Design a protein with these regions (language model features):
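Cyclic-nucleotide recognition modules
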Residues: 73-131
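Glycine- and acidic-residue-biased ligand/ion/polar-headgroup-sensing regions
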Residues: 39, 50-63, 78-80
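Phosphate-/nucleic-acid-contacting segments
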Residues: 154-221
Length: 221
C-alpha cells in the first residue's frame, strides 16, 4: 500500500493522519486492492456490500439503470473519491445504484463494519477516521442535494443553467471544465442529449456562454 500513499494523503477520509497511521488503519479495516477494466461493474444494483470503495486510479460512474437500459448518472468518482459508503454502513442494505468503471481503474475496498466497531488495537487515530467518514458522508449529501436542485427544474434550459451556474460558483471561475462528456451530462441532468444540444446552441447564440467539449465559459451581460 506504500505506493498509494500520495493518493491517500490527499483524500478527505484520511485528513489529519500520518503515513504510519494511514497504513495502520488500512490493516485494521482489512483493506484490499482490486482492479477493474473499463466498462465493468464494480458494484451492481440488487447486491449488498460490506465494503466501500476508494478510487486509487482511473474513474467510475455511479449510475441508476432501468430494465430498458435508460441510465441516470448520479455522480462521477475520480482518483481519491469514495463510493458505496451509505450501503456499506447499513447492514443488509440493497444497492439501488451501480458503479461502473469509466476507464481501467484500481480500487481500494474498506470494510466499514470494522471501521465502525471498536479497534482491536485501541488506536487513537481510529476516532479521527470515524469523524472523517462523517464529514465525507455529509459532503456527499450536499452533492446529491445539488443534483436534486438541478433536475427539479422544469425545462432542459433551466437544468443546464442551474448546473453550469453551480459549477462556476464551486470552481470560483466563469471559465471551467466539467467532469462529463455530452452524453454523460444529459444522463446526469435526466434530459435527452439531442434536446440538450439544441439548448446549448441557443444559449451560445444568445451570448450566455461559450462551450467546446467539456469546457464552458459563462458570459455576463
Amino acid at each position: 500500500m506504500q505506493k498509494y500513499l500520495p493518493v491517500l494523503r490527499n483524500c478527505p477520509f484520511f485528513t489529519g493522519l500520518t503515513d504510519d497511521e494511514i497504513l495502520s488503519i488500512l490493516h485494521c479495516v482489512s483493506a484490499a486492492k482490486i482492479t477493474r477494466p473499463r466498462g465493468s461493474y464494480i458494484f451492481r444494483a440488487g447486491d449488498s456490500t460490506e465494503v466501500m470503495g476508494l478510487m486509487l486510479s482511473g474513474s467510475a460512474l455511479v449510475i441508476q439503470e432501468d430494465l430498458w437500459g435508460h441510465r441516470n448518472i448520479l455522480s462521477k468518482c475520480n482518483t481519491g473519491d469514495f463510493f458505496g459508503e451509505p450501503y456499506a454502513a447499513t447492514p443488509g442494505a440493497i444497492l439501488n445504484i451501480s458503479v461502473v468503471a469509466e476507464e481501467d481503474c484500481e480500487i481500494l475496498l474498506l470494510n466499514v463494519k470494522r471501521l465502525l466497531t471498536a479497534c482491536p488495537t485501541a488506536c487513537d487515530h481510529h476516532q479521527k477516521l470515524i469523524r472523517n467518514l462523517v464529514s465525507v458522508l455529509a459532503n456527499k449529501i450536499l452533492l446529491f442535494n445539488d443534483k436534486i436542485t438541478h433536475v427539479s427544474k422544469r425545462t432542459t434550459r433551466e437544468k443546464l443553467l442551474s448546473y453550469l451556474s453551480a459549477e462556476s460558483i464551486r470552481q470560483s471561475s466563469l471559465s471551467f471544465d466539467i467532469p462529463f462528456d455530452r452524453q454523460q451530462l444529459a444522463d446526469f441532468l435526466c434530459v435527452e442529449r439531442a434536446a440538450m444540444s439544441v439548448e446549448l446552441s441557443k444559449l451560445q447564440k444568445e451570448g450566455l456562454l461559450v462551450t467546446k467539449r467539456n469546457h464552458f465559459e459563462l458570459l455576463t451581460r
